[in-house]
Curated annotation (Swiss-Prot):
InterPro entries: KH_dom, KH_dom-like_a/b, KH_dom_type_2, KH_sf_prok-type, Ribosomal_S3_C_sf, Ribosomal_uS3_bac-typ, Ribosomal_uS3_C, Ribosomal_uS3_CS. GO terms for cellular component: cytosolic small ribosomal subunit. It comes from Baumannia cicadellinicola subsp. Homalodisca coagulata. Residues 39-107 form the KH type-2 domain. It comes from the Bacteria. This is Small ribosomal subunit protein uS3.
Length: 233
């Protein structure tokens, strides 16, 4: 009945990577999983303005290595690396093991579904007209080379009494093609008249020969010591 599988989970292990890459026995698995959850929760609360697109956690030899993909690395690193060092110490206390933090810069945030969704959420919370925010996001993403994008908002749009859903799409967004590199994220805008949901799908192209998706817009940083359519439901 029109229900869609999560595009990222659908492609996991085929063209998408896991966000946590470690192995554990039965006794340690729950502990590691809980530790990962607390670390991600801590980073989300501490780095709300850093435009974080992804956090990858690895656990080599009784330590934890965290790679933060961000569009604003300067906010995380801080002056002479002071902020990232404080962050490292806090994560070591939460995880209970020595930690290492790597920063990877997202060169084109307009091609990242999470950052696009958060941008739309921020504009809606600042009372920007939702249609304008959606159209601007679609235009910027297509201009930077995406093959297609779909943006959907739902809730009490513009404060009306009855909730509804509106969406814009430009280009192709083939959700059932496993080799299609689809980036997806859902976010929420908290307004005075309720919560508005924002969903973003971005089609970056097809990945052939069973190769895993590699984000071309990311560069590691070592801290110092077609046609537009409109729809309504």
């Amino acid at each position: 009945m029109g229900q869609k599988v999560h595009p990222n989970g659908f492609r996991l292990g085929i063209i998408k990577y896991w966000n946590s890459t470690w192995y554990a026995n039965k006794k340690e698995f729950a502990q590691y999983l809980n530790s990962d959850f607390k670390v991600r929760q801590f980073l989300a609360s501490e780095l709300t303005k850093a435009s974080i697109s992804r956090v990858v956690i690895e656990r080599p030899a009784k330590s934890i290595r965290i790679t933060i993909h961000t569009a604003r690395p300067g906010i995380i690193i801080g002056k002479k690396g002071e902020d990232v060092e404080k962050l490292r110490k806090s994560i070591s206390l939460i995880a209970g093991v020595p930690s290492q933090i790597n920063i990877a810069e997202v060169r084109k945030p307009e091609l990242n579904a999470k950052l696009v969704a958060e941008s739309i959420v921020s504009q809606i919370e600042r009372r920007v007209i939702f249609r304008r925010a959606m159209k601007r996001a679609v235009q910027n993403t297509i201009r930077l080379g995406a093959k297609g994008i779909k943006v959907e908002v739902s809730g009490r749009l513009s404060g009306v009494e009855i909730a509804r859903t509106e969406w814009y799409r430009e280009g192709r967004v083939p959700l059932h093609t496993l080799r299609a590199d689809i980036d997806y994220h859902v976010s929420e805008a908290h307004t005075t008249y309720g919560v508005i949901g924002v969903k973003v799908w971005i089609f970056k192209g097809e990945i052939l020969d069973g190769m895993m998706a590699v984000e071309p817009t990311i560069e590691s940083i070592t801290p110092p010591k077609t046609q537009q359519r409109k729809g309504r439901k």
